[in-house]
């Protein structure tokens, strides 16, 4: 074994030009394969991330569920994450907007909207706390509001009730929209405690945002029936079930276009590399035949000849493959990050 290895190493060392060219080809091939696979995987992940920002990361939504239905949903093993949003009521001056309580899970699941993002302070936790953008506070007559300030707003719990003054403490300031095309349409966050105080237990309604766990074993082919079956078992009407199809298409269905392009490129690179390495081997093939002939004449068996040729190739890959992997990963990572940054700047 050691003799065969020494002969293989000596052969590679003797044919320096050929060995260097082969090592460069292997290194370049490895590097290109790593770059394509890494960038392709990054593109798929980026598309999924952008889908969450555009459509939200919840699998679905159960609208207007009562307390009993909420408890049933929480018991389901197929449900992974649950977020609760409640409509607090109506604030005068924000009739076309939303006054809601939303827990941290919901805020993470919602599509990106700068009006949901805190600029200062914290989201409401105590009963009388509120968070909104400065545009809202300006619209209701409070200018230069700061975190910790107290404001009195006209509030009613529903269309059937009358407005009444309620004192709130500003817990946070949200970012404002770039332009308000609809009058009195602001995002205002309240707390769950405020909702519980103002709405009787039997009248409370919850919007349940959720994702499914791996145990649900869903795909685009069966996700809708699975979600509807969960709703039925929890006593939720089908008309109150919303499935986030646009997001699920990215999460549950791979990007076939990206995979196909990467597959074609990888196949082309492999074929091209095989041709290049084959042609390099043809250089000085006469001398190699003579060398192998002499070794065989000395009594080498067919198995030993195969081992010799195999080990010559192994010695050439010891250095070239790790270098190709390293440079491929670094180039792919830096190049992909640069492309993403350029895309964000546009």
Regions found by a protein language model. Give the residues of each.
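Short, membrane-interfacial amphipathic segments enriched in basic
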Residues: 1-6, 303
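Hydrophobic alpha-helical transmembrane segments of multi-pass inner-membrane transport and secretion
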Residues: 16-44, 253-294, 313-327
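Basic-flanked hydrophobic alpha-helices used for secretion and membrane insertion
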Residues: 41-249
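Membrane-spanning helices that line or support transport/gating and their immediate boundary helices
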Residues: 42, 46, 284, 334-341
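Short alpha-helical segment immediately N-terminal to, or the first helix within
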Residues: 139, 283, 294-295, 308
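Short helix-loop junctions at transmembrane helix boundaries
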Residues: 325-346
């Amino acid at each position: 074994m050691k003799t065969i290895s020494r002969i293989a190493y000596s052969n590679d060392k003797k044919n320096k030009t050929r060995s260097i060219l082969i090592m460069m080809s292997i290194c370049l091939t490895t590097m290109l394969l790593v770059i394509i696979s890494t960038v392709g995987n990054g593109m798929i992940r980026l598309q999924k991330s952008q889908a969450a920002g555009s459509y939200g990361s919840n699998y679905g939504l159960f609208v207007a569920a009562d307390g009993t239905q909420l408890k049933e949903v929480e018991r389901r093993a197929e449900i992974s994450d649950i977020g609760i949003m409640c409509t607090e009521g109506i604030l005068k001056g924000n009739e076309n907007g939303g006054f809601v309580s939303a827990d941290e899970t919901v805020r993470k699941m919602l599509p990106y909207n700068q009006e949901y993002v805190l600029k200062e302070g914290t989201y409401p936790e105590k009963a009388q706390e509120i968070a909104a953008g400065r545009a809202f506070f300006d619209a209701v007559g409070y200018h230069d509001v700061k975190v910790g300030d107290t404001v009195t707003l006209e509030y009613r719990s529903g269309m059937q009730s009358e407005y009444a003054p309620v004192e709130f403490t500003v817990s946070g300031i949200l970012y404002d929209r770039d332009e308000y095309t609809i009058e009195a349409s602001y995002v205002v966050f309240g707390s769950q405690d405020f909702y519980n105080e103002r709405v009787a237990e039997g009248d409370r309604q919850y919007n349940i945002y959720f994702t499914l766990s791996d145990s649900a074993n869903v795909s685009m082919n069966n996700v809708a029936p699975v979600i509807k079956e969960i709703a039925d078992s929890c006593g939720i009407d089908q008309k109150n079930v919303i499935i986030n199809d646009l997001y699920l298409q990215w999460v549950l269905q791979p990007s076939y276009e990206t995979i196909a392009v990467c597959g074609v490129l990888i196949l082309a690179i492999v074929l091209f590399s095989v041709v290049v390495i084959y042609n390099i081997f043809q250089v000085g093939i006469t001398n190699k035949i003579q060398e192998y002939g002499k070794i065989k004449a000395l009594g080498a068996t067919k198995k030993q000849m195969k081992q010799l040729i195999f080990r010559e190739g192994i010695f050439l890959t010891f250095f070239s493959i790790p270098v190709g992997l390293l440079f491929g990963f670094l180039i792919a990572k830096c190049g992909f990050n640069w492309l993403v940054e350029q895309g964000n700047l546009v």
